[in-house]
Amino acid sequence: KMAIYHFSVKTISRGNGRSAVACAAYRSGEKLVCNFYGKEQDYTKKTGVEFTEIYAPENTNTELLNRQTLWNKVEKAERRKDALLAREFEIAFPGELNAEQRKNMLNELCQNLVKKYGVIVDAAIHAPHTDSGSDERNYHAHIMFTTRSINEHGDFSAKKYRDFSRDNGTETVSHWRESFAELCNHHLKQNGFDERVDH
């Protein structure tokens, strides 16, 4: 039997008029102030945010573990009008998993991202939007992560990492699609389900 599989990679860039702070506020269902645009982004009325967490390398300055400080610092570091502010994985959880199992699966995925790239990851699990007629089992997560890694001083490094850039981006995305499918199957098996996903 097949379980649900969805994994996509998106970019959040200023060139499209987007703000990393606004995106983070929406995904976490919080009220954050975006210093770059001088705007308050209030999504506290948004329902269906099941879980949020910020994952970061151990030596990260503690101020960067605060959602508002983190994304405002990202906005400040990127001066160009077309700057790439963050990347995002959008994933769907197999419908078989419960809240605790979804959280464990998200933790593993985000910790892998931190380990591989040394970046800060801001993740949120959302309940399905049942009013829009979507499949009600489709719990999904938005996983935003920084385009710069954390250096030995616990701050953003001067250079952006290139893994997702034009040269080897396709390969990187294929790798993550594959490892996400493996992660889904591992968690399905671990929790006693026969269903598997195929990417």
Which residue stretches match the model-derived regions?
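N-terminal nicking endonuclease/strand-transfer module with a His-rich metal-binding environment
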Residues: 1-199
